[in-house]
């Protein structure tokens, strides 16, 4: 049995297709959704969502948001999203390295705002790299 999964960002619909399973980066950890799941509303962290369709997994980088599960429909509203197969792996690696360096520098300073911004940029870069298939070592 399948469910309908939609990933909607402010600028586009990133995914709108049936799926057999979804794994979401919720604020309490990874959350697996199968068909006939109980109704649910949850907040999502910046991270990688995985969708299983026809025995193949598709990775999508999510930039935080919310997910609603009801009647075999999973609706995901996010601040931004990008399919892993559209992300340039080398560019994602470079962005991750730059974000990692910026975070290390921000942690040495005293500005809380700079630390928060660097942490958010790091999480976005990490999600994009993971979705593109890159290995992340922290």
Swiss-Prot record:
Localization: Cellular thylakoid membrane
Pfam family, one: ATP-synt_DE
InterPro entries: ATP_synth_F1_dsu/esu (IPR001469), ATP_synth_F1_dsu/esu_N (IPR020546), ATP_synth_F1_esu_C (IPR020547), ATPsynth_dsu/esu_N (IPR036771)
Membrane topology: Peripheral membrane protein
Gene Ontology CC terms, in alphabetical order: plasma membrane-derived thylakoid membrane; proton-transporting ATP synthase complex
GO molecular function terms noted in the UniProt entry: ATP binding; proton-transporting ATP synthase activity, rotational mechanism
Keyword Thylakoid listed: yes
Alphabetically ordered keywords of this record: ATP synthesis, CF(1), Hydrogen ion transport, Ion transport, Membrane, Thylakoid, Transport
Cystine crosslinks: none
Domain of life: Bacteria
Function noted in UniProt: Produces ATP from ADP in the presence of a proton gradient across the membrane.
Subunit structure: F-type ATPases have 2 components, CF(1) - the catalytic core - and CF(0) - the membrane proton channel. CF(1) has five subunits: alpha(3), beta(3), gamma(1), delta(1), epsilon(1). CF(0) has four main subunits: a(1), b(1), b'(1) and c(9-12).
Family label: Belongs to the ATPase epsilon chain family.
UniProt protein name: ATP synthase epsilon chain
Organism: Thermosynechococcus vestitus (strain NIES-2133 / IAM M-273 / BP-1)
